[in-house]
Regions:
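C-terminal cap of metal-dependent C-N hydrolases
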Residues: 266-323
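Metal-coordinating catalytic core of metallo-dependent amide/deamination hydrolases
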Residues: 20-154
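Non-catalytic positions within long, well-ordered alpha-helices that form the structural scaffold/packing
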Residues: 1-4, 30, 164, 191
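A conserved active-site cap/scaffold subdomain adjacent to cofactor or substrate pockets
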Residues: 157-158, 164-201
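His/Asp/Glu-enriched, well-ordered alpha-helical/loop segment
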Residues: 139-146, 188-284
Length: 325
């Protein structure tokens, strides 16, 4: 409900390590009419919270069951996605098995990579046979054109080149990166390497499930790099908006289906009310605006779910919620 009310028509969900609850999330997502990739989280290494650690063989078996049962449901817009939590929480055997599973069923893959410098060092120590974090995923068949990796704040030039070569994508999660002081992703540099990039929220790491917030934080991250003279120019608001829409669809390999209003694509849209009674910003009748463009710019900068009156997924109105959900 929260993600739909915030206007998210397509989501990538990390569920839990539990198969049945992950399947339930997929069922609920389908019932609400959202387009989504849902993943059963996999981790067989976890000293911090041992009760979350799975036995490798059981994890693989349960992931296979999750994929099989979800595919059998034949939901029109909800698909399984292979989800190793991240490198340090998985053994090499598990990563390899998950890569085989993704390859066998031609599935999408999601995980985290290079969120903070300590994580990068941990991966180097845990997997010394690999040149870098990206190679760990790549050699285990988890870095493909159907892969989306969150964060990527500390990728090297070589890793960005490998991302581009494989057609893998990055989900930029600036709210989380600021909140956890993980780092600042240089989006301009990523795009210059021809790596697909969309925006994410990393809820639990960040504090907002709103893509509007993700746009604002993306601008802040870009501005901070310009202030510190890392980049000569920052992103424009139009570029940040494109990353949240078409960029996200490209990251998920859905840009032939969604991402903009090109003829033939599915109609995903929000009806925006800039004059909502409880709007977080004010508009005045004397303001001389280019109504459509400027109103949208203000909405993106200052608005929130209170300004979203209706949400449509593939032409079907999903917000306000129907009485059946």
């Amino acid at each position: 409900r929260r993600t739909l009310k915030n206007g998210t028509t397509t989501a990538c969900y990390f569920a839990t390590i539990h198969t049945d609850s992950s399947l339930l999330l997929a069922e609920i997502t389908d019932k609400f009419g959202q387009r989504a990739f849902v993943g059963k989280v996999c981790m067989d290494t976890n000293d911090s919270v041992p009760q979350y650690r799975e036995i490798t063989a059981d994890c693989v078996q349960e992931t296979e069951r999750f994929v099989k049962e979800l595919l059998e449901k034949k939901y029109p817009r909800v698909q399984p996605i292979i989800t190793p939590r991240f490198g340090p929480s998985c053994t090499e055997d598990l990563l390899n098995a998950l890569g085989d599973l993704a390859e066998t069923h031609d599935l999408h893959v999601q995980s985290h990579i290079s969120e903070n410098e300590e994580e990068v060092k941990l991966v180097e120590n845990m997997f010394p046979a690999y040149q870098n974090y990206t190679e760990l995923y790549d050699k285990n068949k988890l870095l493909t054109s159907k892969t989306v990796m969150a964060h990527a704040c500390h990728l090297s030039e070589e890793e960005l080149k490998l991302f581009s070569l494989r057609g893998a994508a990055i989900s930029h999660c600036p709210n989380s990166n600021f909140s956890l002081r993980s780092g600042v992703l240089n989006v301009r540099k990523v795009l210059e390497h021809n790596v697909k990039l969309g925006l994410g929220t990393d809820v639990a790491g960040g504090y907002s499930a709103s893509m509007l917030d993700a746009i604002r934080k993306t601008m802040m991250a870009s501005n901070s790099l310009q202030i510190n003279k890392v980049n000569e120019t920052g992103l424009t608001l139009e570029e940040a908006f494109q990353l949240a829409t078409l960029g996200g669809s490209q990251a998920l390999g859905l840009d032939d289906v969604i991402g903009n209003f090109e003829v033939g694509k599915e109609f995903d849209a929000l009806l925006i009310n800039t004059k909502a009674s409880d709007s977080p910003f004010d508009l005045f009748s004397a303001d001389d605006f280019e109504v459509i463009r400027t109103g949208l710019m203000i909405k993106k900068l200052m608005g929130d779910d209170r300004n979203i009156s209706e949400v449509y997924v593939a032409g079907k109105q999903v917000v306000p919620f129907s009485s059946s959900v």
